[in-house]
A protein has these predicted regions:
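Membrane-water interface of transmembrane alpha-helices
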Residues: 57-77
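Helix-coil boundary and interhelical linker segments in multi-pass alpha-helical membrane proteins
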Residues: 33-41, 114-124
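Cytosolic-side membrane-entry/anchor segment at the start of a transmembrane helix
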Residues: 1-31, 140-150
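Helical transmembrane-bundle signal
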Residues: 15-22, 51-59, 104-107, 111, ...
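Short membrane-interface loop/juxtamembrane segments of multi-pass integral membrane proteins
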Residues: 77-99
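Alpha-helical transmembrane segments and their membrane-interface junctions
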Residues: 98-120
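Alpha-helical transmembrane segments
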Residues: 41-61, 129-133
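C-terminal or internal capping secondary-structure element at the end of a domain, subdomain, or sheet
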Residues: 118-150
Length: 150
């Protein structure tokens, strides 16, 4: 697995975990009747902190563990290929395009709920939801392009 594929896989796993936590907490707030601005904005903070710190920590940990395993197997220092060639840049560009497309669609749907009479809190909750989903879809698309060989 290439350096870029490892990064994408770790990011995908982290954002799937974050999406699960986010959906669990939103459903829990709705069922408890505690779906208010304070709780939703606190959840936003948790999601943002998780997205930043867990992704960075998990990426570093994954590369360290993969390097240790490779060093044990080959009895040599592992070669880290973090150089991006044109293919990697094109895959990243196409993945970013898909991410932005899904994000834009999510913003449109979120705004549509507001115009259809839903409270602004629903719109803000959907904005974060669609942002995370867009990132997941973009990562899946990037992985598919790497697996397909572009």
């Amino acid at each position: 697995m290439s350096f870029q594929e490892k990064n994408i896989t770790v990011s995908l796993a982290n954002f799937l975990l974050i999406l699960g936590i986010y959906l669990f907490r939103v459903v829990q707030m709705i069922l408890d009747g505690s779906f208010n601005a304070t709780n939703v904005f606190r959840l936003w903070g948790i999601v943002i902190v998780l997205a930043i710190f867990v992704t960075v920590f998990a990426t570093i940990l994954t590369h360290v563990i993969a390097s240790i395993i490779q060093a044990i197997k080959t009895k040599a220092e592992p070669l880290v290929e973090s150089i991006q060639d044109e293919r990697d840049r094109l895959i990243d560009l196409r993945g970013t395009k898909i991410t932005y497309t899904f994000s834009s669609l999510g913003v449109f749907l979120s705004m549509l709920t507001f115009t259809l009479g839903q409270p602004p809190l629903v719109m803000f909750t959907l904005l974060i939801f669609f942002g995370v989903v867009a990132h997941i879809v973009g990562d899946i698309f990037r992985l598919l392009l790497y697996r397909r060989g572009f």
